Amino acid sequence: MELRALLLCPDARSAQLLGEILAEQGIAVDQASDSATALESVATRRFDALILDADDEERAKEILSKARLSALNSGTLVVALVASTSNVRQFFSMGANFVLYKPLSGERARVSLKAARALMRREPRRAPRIPVHAPAGIAYA
């Protein structure tokens, strides 16, 4: 199973750079053109990573909180793209795992996403294991 990331970034240059870096690391990218599309995708599909541009902080927080509340994406790794003047504590408190500062540098983004990739290791089983409790006995013949 391949890893999949949802990318919401209105800046075409940054989106292209991130898409190339993710593709180099073997991560398939679903690019959302707007926050409504991203909200719909988060509600209906499972992603291994969400990469959200935080220029519109309210919409980014809405997507992040919806992901954290959904059964599909509650444990999904989140990377927030923020301006250097943004309050990153809010994003970390809402569950963001990584922050990339804009404007993006290719090398800095590559190193950060490589570190994030290590945390995205997918469960090799199709479904998680569920504990089962049943009475059992041992008989010696």
Model-derived regions: residue spans:
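Alpha2 helix of the CheY-like receiver
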Residues: 39-40, 110
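Non-catalytic positions within long, well-ordered alpha-helices that form the structural scaffold/packing
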Residues: 43, 89-92
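Anion (oxyanion) recognition and catalysis
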Residues: 23, 72, 93
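Short hydrophobic/Thr-rich beta-strand motif most characteristic of the beta2 strand and flanking loop
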Residues: 26-34, 41
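Structural beta-sheet core signal
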Residues: 7, 78-80
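Active-site charged/polar residues at nucleotide-handling catalytic sites that mediate phosphoryl
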Residues: 3, 45, 94
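Conserved phosphotransfer microenvironments
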Residues: 15, 34-39, 47-74, 82-87
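N-terminal helix initiation/capping motif
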Residues: 1-4, 8, 12-28, 86-89, ...
